[in-house]
Amino acid sequence: MYKRQDYVTVFQETYNSDKYETLHLAGHKRIFPYRLNAQERALKGGMRGVGFAALLGLDDFRKDAFATGYHAYLLQRKYPHAEIAFSCPRLRPIINNDRINPMDVHEPQLLQVVCAYRLFMPFASITVSTRECERVRDNLVGIAATKISAGVSTGIGSHVEDIEDKGDDQFEISDGRSVDEVYKALLDHDLQPVMNDYVYL
């Protein structure tokens, strides 16, 4: 049965176009304006919501966080019906790649970004990925984050069973808990785990 897709998240990586050019040398992704306008194209195409993310640490994280928030804010004003979400990934060690040196974003800086998003756009959802350790994620969902992943694989093609030539993991996972373990942790923090955020009637 065909399921309609209705949500798009785009990882802009950095809003510094000069830095962006050094990271993407070929393919469609290298065209900065095309990438930048992806969320608006998705909303025009009928998506109910869009997500935004800069990879914090590729460039000045405060500038990228500000640009991410402002980008989302402008689209929220233009498309008030749209659901808006932020992801807050920090640059982590990359397997088989020692050429990208992160501009370190430590836990206090990550907390600053997450709280800034929450204050700036109080109705947006905020995701904290398994790049972060169990302690950080458990604390952030008690402060400002609304979504966390669990039981994740970051290998390219790793969710497809019939692909033989699968890629390496894209980054190291810091929180390896299963879905059941994360579910229980949320209950232990007096939070209500919700496995889906909408129901079609």
Language-model features: locations:
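Conserved non-cysteine loop/helix-boundary elements of the Radical SAM core domain that shape
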Residues: 3-47, 55-77, 98-107
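Short hydrophobic alpha-helical runs that function as membrane-insertion/retention elements
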Residues: 9, 50-51, 147-151
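Short beta-strands and strand-loop turn motifs
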Residues: 49-55, 86-90
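Auxiliary Fe-S-binding modules of radical SAM enzymes
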Residues: 66, 77-201
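Proline- and acidic/polar-enriched loop/turn elements at helix boundaries
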Residues: 12, 54-55, 152, 198
